[in-house]
């Protein structure tokens, strides 16, 4: 199982002792693991007046609007915006609704349709006292809608029209919430509207709490179904988030261990073998489904949750949250089409019998998973997934409030007992918790833990709940985990075609429009919390800062909800505070790049794997576009030739790679361990030789590793893929009893018999002698007995159970094949080998009592059966068969094939017919006449524009193919009248925003090297300035560069000076010595300082010789002309400190000439270390621009968020010191 923990520790800047930081996470176990979803909460002491309620800045986060219903053309219909399906029918057959909202200087045309989130059989069931059950038609679902904003196809809308408009509106880069205007808020602003109008408040997530405060204010008259949270989470006690798994009942912790370790709970009674295979549903592959995958979801709200929001309003609230969850799973970055379908909602007024819910998340989830496993619909069908929403402040390891947000089993989806999660109600952020926990149920683990994805990239599966500038998406690792899970049989429950959904809809507004920033703070920090009023309004789109009694502003580093107001006519969209209602580019759906070349084969023999891959980058999905459908890789087998006989098994090679790597401080010799569960066949399990333990050394074996010794199937990317006897991936071809691929046993002769003789105990007795070349050998006892099967050769060499020594069951390789020896306490003994054998074998029985009877059988190819007299002589003759012509015109060939027939009608192997009488099979010419002329189009030219609609053209030719010739151009009149298209429109999608640099400024210096700057803005095609995040897909042009207007006056102290001569290049005879010119400056003290040569480029170099000959002593002359090594002087060291290298040349010389007669072991060294003294530490110069802008910056490195865009820049000095 996996728990999602949100660390709520309020860290006071002036508090004593070091604050607790977000803890690290342990490893993930194989089946049931617990995952920690952690985020540090920073509390900063700010000067605040206790009476502050948010300040005037809140006006920038919300506006008052009056929505009106319009028709599809935008024409006014009515101010009455309360809609149910019955009402809609009056306007026509269309199910769509249209509203217009004017806000922030723009008209938003909302186009809505009934939401497909709910099943047509969706019902709300209320479980009351004494188990009383009430099932009713829900009032809310008839007014739930989803849709988009007209002229902004990257937008999404999810609203309820039950009592005005309430919900979420998402544009390209902003998120808004909308809800009916609370009366108290209207009174504060002295606002009133004409009779018949229904005023609403449109606000960002930053204003959610403020609007919500007015909605929940005692005595406040609400004009929409509100949610009045009475739950105040207790202050965090700096508790460590916990990470644990249950596979072997061991405990691990997220972060540092507490002073005491909680006792692990007892074994879960319900954690039994999963029953996802017994649902009766078709087990098609979910990963290869061409349609969307549907997660039929049961949602259960406990009594505290129902009490918190009210029985009448909780349904609307839950469906609003689930609608947000649905949109997160429809995000293009997930890479699959996942539909969340709510089939039932159960509201608990009291806990039913058998269900225990309290603060203890682990125990509560155990109880809930077991309880929901017994729930079955009236039609006998079960839900695929169950979600428990609780009003308890849950804790993963004790029955007290702490920092846990959710809990879920990893890879539990579709399991009867493990497809379930528990999630703590925290407001609209609950949607992210549900998506995160359900992601674990889909087999996803945290980013950055055992995978290459980074922890703090703002993805849904990040261990810390921190968005990428307020935007959450799915990482590439999450896509891979999901893809792997969907390829398993377990995911088959998701392939069900969804039944037509009913009339139930989701709220059609952004969450931040329905619930303002104050309400979001109240959900996160308690009923008395509200938005912090001290200058953090513009940053709430990245992190929502809240203020509660105690004069502290604090955050959980979670962004305000999409659509939360962040300023005057501004709202939060995708983590940016942007202009309200700003329209963005259309979604760009991802398209695949071209396939790459085939990779290298993973093996040199024995059947490896190679692949081609492509990337979803042509273009990549943007602005809400869909991820590319299909697979990013295709595989095929390669190098299928057998490996040499004595070569090491491929799996054994991989285990042997760990022989020289210490394992827990010791070296072992490893060999493969294959007695594992079927789903673990593609993991690398190795056993230490001479020790009784094995370990999973790798999560997956190398591609091309056989899944098991006796099958053709191979492992690819950790998944066992089917391979037929024809060595084709995905092939179901099998060999017959005689090893003929796709054979029908027609070439086999079968032998079988029964051995029933009784003998004296404790002796060996022959059962059957099977000759070499036998295949499909099977020897089996008829009943359980105390006797044992044995095998030996004709020369009395025992291969199995010889010398009265009983072998354990397993695989035994001898006689050219592998025998599978099965012996169980409740089944008779059995021996099986596919063959063929390369020697004659004698199968015996070592009697230990009565012989129950032994059945044996084997097969021999008929051509080998020379000892058996033929019962019938067959007549074999050749016959020719011919194919159709290879072409219909232009000259082709008919291929002719000779086949061997038995008695003129049965085709058999060609070896039965005589080669001497085989007829000729030369191909025949056919259809040797010219083809009709046709148009041959050329390649399309490049598009004239990359976006906004361009043109491309191509040339066409009229060609004709004559017999056995290439096509040649002919008159256009010979071709058909209609011609292929020669010009077409291309790249019709809207142009994305792009960087727009302004002209360069003047150079900062009048001479020498200076700097010039320019402003670089992100602009739309209409030259409107947009947030920089919208242009992040392309490199940002440089805003600063170096410049030189002219050379500065000369430095009179610079001059060229020649260095000293080097040593002579030869120790005897004629050599060469060199020197070089250096650019130096002479100081007042007379010292010379060397500069790069470019500093003296304006000074004329002196005319000096830099190389001259040098004569050393005469080389000795040897009478016997012995070859010797001669070395040059050592060159200058490569560095002055810290350890460098000196080199020299060494030559073998004989009588002054190069020679190869020197002894190699006497050759002097050509390289040596030099200047190994330590270098002095460089002086650090502080960057004057690297400063802290806030007094609480010292907390940022303590909580590990220096890589956060906002906190890293604003607290540069603290982060630099920490590093």
UniProtKB/Swiss-Prot annotation:
Peptidase M12B domain location: 293-498
Cofactor(s) needed for function: Zn(2+)
Enzyme class: hydrolase
Pfam families: ADAMTS_CR_2, ADAMTS_CR_3, ADAMTS_spacer1, Pep_M12B_propep, PLAC, Reprolysin, TSP1_ADAMTS, TSP_1
Active site per database record: 437
GO biological process: extracellular matrix organization; eye development; negative regulation of platelet aggregation; proteolysis
Amino acids binding Zn(2+): 436, 440, 446
PTM: The precursor is cleaved by a furin endopeptidase.
Residues annotated as glycosylated: 151, 190, 745, 838, 865, 909
Covalent S-S links between cysteines: 369-420, 395-402, 414-493, 453-477, 521-546, 532-553, 541-572, 566-577, 601-638, 605-643, 616-628
Localisation: Secreted, Extracellular space, Extracellular matrix
PLAC domain location: 1182-1219
Keyword Glycoprotein: yes
GO MF term (any one): metal ion binding
Compositional bias of kind Polar residues: 218-241
Domain TSP type-1: 589-644, 931-990, 991-1049, 1052-1116, 1121-1176
Cofactor, how bound (note): Binds 1 zinc ion per subunit.
Propeptide: 48-284
GO-annotated cellular components: extracellular region
Alphabetic keyword roster: Disulfide bond, Extracellular matrix, Glycoprotein, Hydrolase, Metal-binding, Metalloprotease, Protease, Repeat, Secreted, Signal, Zinc, Zymogen
Signal sequence interval, chain numbering: 1-47
Region (Disordered): 217-248
Superkingdom: Eukaryota
Name the UniProt record assigns to this protein: A disintegrin and metalloproteinase with thrombospondin motifs 18
Organism, as annotated: Mus musculus
């Amino acid at each position: 199982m996996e728990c999602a923990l949100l660390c709520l520790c309020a860290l006071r800047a002036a508090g004593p002792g070091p604050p607790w930081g977000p803890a690290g996470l342990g490893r993930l176990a194989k089946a049931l693991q617990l995952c920690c979803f952690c985020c540090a909460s920073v509390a900063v002491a700010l000067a605040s007046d206790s009476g502050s309620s948010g300040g005037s800045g809140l006006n920038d986060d919300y506006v008052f609007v009056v929505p009106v219903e319009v028709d599809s053309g935008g024409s006014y219909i009515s101010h009455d915006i309360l809609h149910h399906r019955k009402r809609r029918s009056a306007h026509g057959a269309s199910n769509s609704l249209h509203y217009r909202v004017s806000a922030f200087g723009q008209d938003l045309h909302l186009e809505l349709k009934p939401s497909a989130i709910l099943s047509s059989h969706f019902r709300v069931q209320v479980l009351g006292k004494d188990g009383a059950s009430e099932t009713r038609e829900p009032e809310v679902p008839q007014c739930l809608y989803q849709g988009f904003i007209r002229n902004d196809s990257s937008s999404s809308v999810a609203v309820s029209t039950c009592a005005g408009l309430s919900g979420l509106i998402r544009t390209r880069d902003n998120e808004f919430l909308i809800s009916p205007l609370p009366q108290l808020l209207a009174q504060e602003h002295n606002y009133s509207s004409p009779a018949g109008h229904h005023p609403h408040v449109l606000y960002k997530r930053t204003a959610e709490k403020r609007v919500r405060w007015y909605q929940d204010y005692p005595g406040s008259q609400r004009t929409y179904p509100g949610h009045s949270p009475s739950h105040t989470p207790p202050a965090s006690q700096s508790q460590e988030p916990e990470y644990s798994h249950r596979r072997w009942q061991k405990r691990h912790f997220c972060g540092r261990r507490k002073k005491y370790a909680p006792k692990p709970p007892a074994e879960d009674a319900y954690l039994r073998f999963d029953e996802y295979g017994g649902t009766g549903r078709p087990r098609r592959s979910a990963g290869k489904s061409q349609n969307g995958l549907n997660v039929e979801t049961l949602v259960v709200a406990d009594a505290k949750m129902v009490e918190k929001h009210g029985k009448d309003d909780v349904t609307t609230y839950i469906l609003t949250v689930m609608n947000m969850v649905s949109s997160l799973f429809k995000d293009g970055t997930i890479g699959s089409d996942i539909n969340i379908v709510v089939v039932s909602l159960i509201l608990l007024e009291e806990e039913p019998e058998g269900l225990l819910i309290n603060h203890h998340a682990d125990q509560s989830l155990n109880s809930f998973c077991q309880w929901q496993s017994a729930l079955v619909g009236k039609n006998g069908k079960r839900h695929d997934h169950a979600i428990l929403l609780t009003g308890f402040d849950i804790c993963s390891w004790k029955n007290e409030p702490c920092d846990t947000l959710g809990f879920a089993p990893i890879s539990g989806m579709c399991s009867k007992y493990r497809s379930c999660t528990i999630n703590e109600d925290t407001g609209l952020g609950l949607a992210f918790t549900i998506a995160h926990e359900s992601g674990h149920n889909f087999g996803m683990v945290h980013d950055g833990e055992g995978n290459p994805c980074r922890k703090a990239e703002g993805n849904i599966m990040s261990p810390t709940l921190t968005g990428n500038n307020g935007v959450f998406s799915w990482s590439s690792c999450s896509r891979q985990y999901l893809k792997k899970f969907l390829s398993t049989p377990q995911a088959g429950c998701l392939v069900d075609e969804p039944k037509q959904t009913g009339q139930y809809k989701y709220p059609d507004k952004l969450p931040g429009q329905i619930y303002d920033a104050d309400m979001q703070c109240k959900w996160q920090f308690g009923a008395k919390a509200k938005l912090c009023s001290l200058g953090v309004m513009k940053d709430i789109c990245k992190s929502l800062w809240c203020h509660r009694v105690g004069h502290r502003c604090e955050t959980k580093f979670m962004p305000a909800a999409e659509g939360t107001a962040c300023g005057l006519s501004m709202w939060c969209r995708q983590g940016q505070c942007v202009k309200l209602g700003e329209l963005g580019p259309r979604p760009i759906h991802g398209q695949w790049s071209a396939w790459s070349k085939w990779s290298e084969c993973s093996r040199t023999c024995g059947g490896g794997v190679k692949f081609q891959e492509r990337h979803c980058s042509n273009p990549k999905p943007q602005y809400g576009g869909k991820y590319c459908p299909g697979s990013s890789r295709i595989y095929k087998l390669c190098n299928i030739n057998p490996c040499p006989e004595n070569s090491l098994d491929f799996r054994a090679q991989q285990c042997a790679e760990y022989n020289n790597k210490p394992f827990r401080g010791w070296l072992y010799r490893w060999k493969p361990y294959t007695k594992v569960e079927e789903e673990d066949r593609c993991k690398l399990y190795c056993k230490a030789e001479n020790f009784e333990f094995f370990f999973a050394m790798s999560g997956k074996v190398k591609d091309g590793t056989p899944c098991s010794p006796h099958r053709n199937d191979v492992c690819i990317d950790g998944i066992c893929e089917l391979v037929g006897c024809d060595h084709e991936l995905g092939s179901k071809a099998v060999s017959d009893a005689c090893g003929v691929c796709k054979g029908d046993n027609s070439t086999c002769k079968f032998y079988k018999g029964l051995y029933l003789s009784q003998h004296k105990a404790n002796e060996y007795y022959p059962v059957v002698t099977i000759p070499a070349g036998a295949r499909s050998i099977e020897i089996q006892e008829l009943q359980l007995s105390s006797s044992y099967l044995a095998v030996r050769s004709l020369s009395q060499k025992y291969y199995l159970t010889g010398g009265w020594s009983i072998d354990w069951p397993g695989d035994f390789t001898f006689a050219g094949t592998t025998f599978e020896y099965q012996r169980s306490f409740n089944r008779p003994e059995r021996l099986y080998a596919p063959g063929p054998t390369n020697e004659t074998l004698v199968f015996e029985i070592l009697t230990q009592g009565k012989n129950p009877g032994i059945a044996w059988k084997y097969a021999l190819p008929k051509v080998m059966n020379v000892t058996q007299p033929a019962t019938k002589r067959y007549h074999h003759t050749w016959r020719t068969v011919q194919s159709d012509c290879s072409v219909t015109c232009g000259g082709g060939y008919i291929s002719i094939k000779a086949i061997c027939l038995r008695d003129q009608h049965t085709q058999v192997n060609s070896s039965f017919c005589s080669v001497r009488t085989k007829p000729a099979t030369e191909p025949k010419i056919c259809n040797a006449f010219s083809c009709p002329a046709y148009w041959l189009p050329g390649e399309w030219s490049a598009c004239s524009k990359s976006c906004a609609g361009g043109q491309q053209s191509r040339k066409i030719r009229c060609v004709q193919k004559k017999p056995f010739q290439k096509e040649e151009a002919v008159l256009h009149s010979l071709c058909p009248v209609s011609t292929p298209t020669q010009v077409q429109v291309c790249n019709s999608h809207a142009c994305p925003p792009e960087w727009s640099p302004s002209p360069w400024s003047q150079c900062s210096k009048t001479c020498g090297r200076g700097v010039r700057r320019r402003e670089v803005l992100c602009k739309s095609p209409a030259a409107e300035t947009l947030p920089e995040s919208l242009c992040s897909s392309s490199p940002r042009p440089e805003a600063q560069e170096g410049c030189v207007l002219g050379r500065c006056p000369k430095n009179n102290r610079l001059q060229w000076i020649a260095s000293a001569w080097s040593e002579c290049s030869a120790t005897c005879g004629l050599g060469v010595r060199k020197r070089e010119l250096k650019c130096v400056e002479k100081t007042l003290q007379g010292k010379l300082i060397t500069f790069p040569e470019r500093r003296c480029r304006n000074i004329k170099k002196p005319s000096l010789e830099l190389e001259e000959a040098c004569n050393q002593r005469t080389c000795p002359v040897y009478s016997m002309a012995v070859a010797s090594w001669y070395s040059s002087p050592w060159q200058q060291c490569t560095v002055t400190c810290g350890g460098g290298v000196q080199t020299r040349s060494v030559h073998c010389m004989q009588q002054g000439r190069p020679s190869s007669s020197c002894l190699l072991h006497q050759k002097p060294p050509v390289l040596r270390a030099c200047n190994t003294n330590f270098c002095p530490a460089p002086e650090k110069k502080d960057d004057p621009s690297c400063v802290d802008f806030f007094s609480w910056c010292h907390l940022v490195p303590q909580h590990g968020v220096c890589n956060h865009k906002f906190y890293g820049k604003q607290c540069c000095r603290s982060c630099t010191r920490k590093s």
